[in-house]
């Protein structure tokens, strides 16, 4: 399992994109020689700091079968100061700091917490979120995926599992040339319905 976790809401959709890229490029049932292998790491999207509270119990104490990839931002577009109005409450220590400081402290402390449980992590740091840096990030992740495909010995540029469901949809919707597939598909659907699926 491979977790992509940016600590910036502006990078939230990088995780969505990466999950799609990683799954369709590396989830294969045949290697380049045609051997049946059923391979591919499962990508998971997360957003820091939100998903620390929804997923990290599993990541820290569950099976050690995940790599967590953090994306940090060094310089945010805006700086939001935390006011000192809460001095006499349990969160008074935050007064005078920034939300940017808090976000990076969340990323760093979460990474250390994972290391306490011997969980592997990777951190990518972006100087800032702009077209130049995001383009470099996307390109690096594309190259990473291509290299992973070579290591898994699979064709990263095909997606037969996706094509199959597209063809089934064409058949169900009556696209010309898919009449035989429609008949076969109706039989399969009836069989699944009888099993209660």
Question: Where does each model-flagged region fall?
Answer:
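A SIS-like phosphosugar-recognition module
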Residues: 1-197
């Amino acid at each position: 399992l491979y977790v992509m976790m940016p600590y910036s809401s502006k990078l939230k959709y990088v995780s969505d994109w990466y999950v799609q890229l990683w799954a369709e490029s590396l989830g294969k049932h045949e290697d380049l020689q045609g051997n049946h292998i059923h391979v591919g790491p499962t990508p998971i999207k997360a957003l820091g700091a939100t998903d620390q509270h929804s997923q990290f119990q599993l990541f820290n104490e569950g099976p050690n079968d995940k790599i967590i990839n953090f994306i940090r931002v060094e310089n945010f577009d805006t700086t939001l100061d935390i006011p000192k109005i809460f001095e006499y409450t349990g969160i008074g220590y935050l007064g005078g700091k920034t939300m940017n400081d808090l976000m990076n402290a969340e990323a760093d402390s979460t990474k250390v917490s994972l290391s306490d449980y011997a969980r592997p992590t990777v951190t990518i740091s972006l100087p800032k979120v702009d077209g130049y840096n995001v383009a470099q990030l996307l390109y690096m992740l594309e190259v990473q995926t291509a290299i992973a495909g070579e290591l898994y010995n699979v064709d990263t540029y095909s997606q037969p599992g996706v094509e199959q469901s597209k063809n089934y949809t064409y058949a169900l919707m009556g696209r010309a040339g898919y009449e035989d597939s429609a008949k076969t598909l109706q039989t399969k659907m009836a069989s699944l319905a009888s099993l209660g699926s």
